[in-house]
Amino acid sequence: MRHFDSMEILNELLKFQSITPDDDGAFNYISMILNDFEEINIDKNGVKNVIFRKTFGPGVHICFAGHIDVVKPGIGWDSDPFDPLQKDGFIYARGAQDMKSAVASMICAVSGVQNFNGTISLLLTSDEEGDAVFGTREALKFLQSRGELPDFAVVGEPTCETVFGDTIKVGRRGSINGILRINGIQGHVAYPNKCVNPVHILASKFANFAGHDFDNGNDFFEPSKLVVVDIRGGMQVCNVTPSDVSVMFNVRNSNLTDANDIKNFINDLYKDCDFDLNLKVSSNPFLTDKNSKIVQKLSQSVQKISGVCPVFTTGGGTSDARYFAEFNVDVAEFGVINDRLHAVNERVSVNEVQKLTEIYKDLIENF
């Protein structure tokens, strides 16, 4: 079997215009490289999920996970976003950081394994950047139905902040979206005593609403803060008071706060008002024990290869790692520096990709 270098793999992956949920042929290319792995295809509603798996012995099952889909490139690039450009030690293309660099490193690392006391798998989806409804979670549901869930997982999201090796994600905040609608009575602005102005009602308590911290955070999570993202009401005229006003907000919550806490807070704050509240939990927070084998072994490999002692954090947005946690699989995340995610002229350091490959290899060898 021919050996594929991680940079060669990355260069080819970046050419695929795999905008969610279209893989654009990327999975066929990966299948060609991992042709001695068992291949399991789990496709649903236009989303492709593929598991490449190989059993070497009776021991633990470690899964490397990621996504091959990317967001649209937009305009303003200095080069073709799907024709990778190597310049001054960087590769420029859409998906370079998020996250084809990690996928390439994972493919290279697992393809070269000769001996391992257990099972190694690679779980890839074409729907992480979109709704992610039929992506990684569907693949894990399938594995659960067969009693084949992995014991540990590494997700290759770009986790590093300023120096390669500085950050391992051991958890993520949850995300709860809400819409609060204050109801009033519409009327003529000249007769405020005959109206019930919902804007005034909202404003009277708004200082206690916007920016509210539901908890004080802990060693791994920042406080769960209510962030207002939009306010709408009225008819865009100056002589009619509105019948209602709506506030859209989001709470990135720690494991100390849930939807009931948010509901109870708003119910109490606006208890004397006529209002409607809609909350939607889009993801739950999770935290992997820092003493878990996957966290400790990954940390050792990162420090060994990069020379940097990583910190364990939970910051940033949501990721597919939450689905592994949902299925009680210990999971940690590690990848390249994340300074150009979804940006024009997205790029990744060649040196980082090479080191990332070595880290994944070292993790397998010493697990």
UniProtKB/Swiss-Prot annotation:
Q: Where does Zn(2+) 1 bind?
A: H67, D98, E157
Could you tell me which Pfam families the record lists for this protein? M20_dimer, Peptidase_M20
The EC number(s) given in the record are 3.5.1.18
**Where does the signal sequence lie?**
none
Give the reaction(s) catalysed.
Answer: N-succinyl-(2S,6S)-2,6-diaminopimelate + H2O = (2S,6S)-2,6-diaminopimelate + succinate
Pathway assigned to this chain's UniProt record: Amino-acid biosynthesis; L-lysine biosynthesis via DAP pathway; LL-2,6-diaminopimelate from (S)-tetrahydrodipicolinate (succinylase route): step 3/3
Question: What would be an example GO MF term here?
Answer: succinyl-diaminopimelate desuccinylase activity
SUPFAM superfamilies the record matches: Bacterial exopeptidase dimerisation domain, Zn-dependent exopeptidases
- Bound cofactor: record note: Binds 2 Zn(2+) or Co(2+) ions per subunit.
Which catalytic residues are annotated?
D69, E128
- Does this UniProt record's set of keywords contain Hydrolase? yes
Q: What class of enzyme is it?
A: hydrolase
Question: What cofactor is needed?
Answer: Zn(2+); Co(2+)
Entry superkingdom: Bacteria
Q: Which InterPro entries match?
A: ArgE/DapE_CS, Bact_exopeptidase_dim_dom, DapE_proteobac, Peptidase_M20, Peptidase_M20_dimer, Peptidase_M20A
- Function per UniProt: Catalyzes the hydrolysis of N-succinyl-L,L-diaminopimelic acid (SDAP), forming succinate and LL-2,6-diaminopimelate (DAP), an intermediate involved in the bacterial biosynthesis of lysine and meso-diaminopimelic acid, an essential component of bacterial cell walls.
HAMAP family from the xrefs?
DapE
Q: Which family does it belong to?
A: Belongs to the peptidase M20A family. DapE subfamily.
Q: What is this protein called?
A: Succinyl-diaminopimelate desuccinylase
- Organism equals Campylobacter hominis (strain ATCC BAA-381 / DSM 21671 / CCUG 45161 / LMG 19568 / NCTC 13146 / CH001A)
The uppermost taxa in this organism's lineage are: Bacteria, Pseudomonadati, Campylobacterota, Epsilonproteobacteria, Campylobacterales
